[in-house]
């Protein structure tokens, strides 16, 4: 992206023995490097029961996350099945690189995919999401996430109790805020609390109610009957 442009890379762990050379080249140009690993928690307080790869992490306070800070909600992210990243040494004074999501110090990882089997195993406070902005390339922006599963219905369905609602909305809101930041729109776009609204019809009396009930039942039956008659005529023609 030499002439500007923005990109989000969601790099879920992949056990295939291959290197993402093109993606790594893009990330390195923005001062970010990627680990070929899969992060997990050693402290049972930081993951759901029997799901050590579903990690409770911290959303860091940056200029990008200021809208989330203002909500007063805990700056906590839920990252399932994630790899980690780390800053790369790049000689570019116009480049700004920040961490977005960082694990607790009790996190560690295992080598997962890639061709560097002798690589040092990352552990401790690991970066699960980072972002960068390069003024020398028309303020081109890049965000990297160690997991794409955070946006799937399957992940939400796999959780129970308080785990299902406490951390996921803030993680998804972080994604929305990043998209808004890249599009130079309002970074206050985020999920609000769900509210149920019930529509109703006011019926003056029982006689009118019975009449409406007959209409509601008979009209669909009549339409279905007409459809069957037309179908039979076409079939026998």
Regions inferred by a protein language model and the residue ranges of each:
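Alpha-helical transmembrane segments
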Residues: 219-233
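Short, aromatic-rich amphipathic segments at membrane interfaces
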Residues: 190-213
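Pore-lining and gate-forming transmembrane alpha-helices of multi-pass membrane transport proteins
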Residues: 168, 172, 207, 211-215, ...
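Short, Lys/Arg-enriched, Gly/Pro-containing loop segments at transmembrane-helix junctions
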Residues: 235-237
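Acidic, S/T/G-rich, low-cysteine, solvent-exposed domains in lumenal/extracellular/periplasmic regions
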Residues: 1-187
